Amino acid sequence: MYQFVSLLRLNKPIGIFLLFWPCAWSLTMTQWFVVNNYLFIKYLILFFIGSIIMRSAGCVYNDIVDKKIDFRVQRTKKRLIASGKISVTTAWLSISFLIIPALIILFQFNNFSKILGLSSGLLIITYPFMKRITFWPQLFLGFTFNWGVLLGWSVFFENITLETIILYMTGVFWTLGYDTIYALQDKVDDLKIKVKSTAIKFRHDLKNFLFFCYISSITLLVALGFLTGRSFIYFILIAIAALHLTFQVIIIQKIKSNNKDKIQKVFNSNNSFGLLIFLIFFLEIYYG
């Protein structure tokens, strides 16, 4: 049983929350324009369950595609598929079982959202191959991992607006930053086996690159606030969120590249940032 918990990464739930928070931001933003407590809570629950399912399926699929790469990387060589403890066939069966409840959730939404949700499949399928062909797999993950922003808005309004795009790109730059931090754990091994990442591309200018990513996210959140007429407190709280990201960059600069535990802790702290933005958005429903 524990093997399947490990295969689905349920023992490492940080990825579930990083996938869920952008969905929650978007769902909460809809309530700035039309308050429907029942649907809001219902969709939050469905999106959270969906995040668990899709993150698990994505991890299994990535492990299948990256089997040979994972075996050559110190941090991942003991993963169940890479080590041969679970067969590729069993892994595919696991994905099949996960897709069924995911589709059940998706098909509760309107037709626009169904098409939008299904279209994310192309990004999910393509993502694991990006590290082989470009130094920007983290950017591609950003576009993939934040698709829930578009979906969260569309389940209420059946469209995509400028506000949605701004929030989507907020998540993309945030993911680009935090996944670059995550990739630092494997930088030495990735250089040896020629796996590409932004952690490698910007290894000599990491601080400036991370600041670029995080400043872009905060700037977009500020722009969103002005566009939607947010309250003064919104901008104060966004400034506090900006400090959170700033401290990440400062701390990561002081960590040695072989200290994977500390790198992981900085990466994990993004769960707090995601929660903070959700709470800021939630407060705006009633005080904005």
State the predicted function of each range.
Residues 1-4, 59-86, 180-203, 251-262:
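Cytosolic, membrane-interface loops and tails of multi-pass inner-membrane proteins
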Residues 2-6, 25, 49, 56-57, ...:
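Intramembrane alpha-helical segments
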Residues 10-29, 146, 276-278:
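The first (N-terminal) embedded transmembrane alpha-helix
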Residues 14-18, 38, 42-46, 50, ...:
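Alpha-helical transmembrane segments of integral membrane proteins
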Residues 219, 223-288:
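Extended hydrophobic alpha-helices typical of membrane-associated regions
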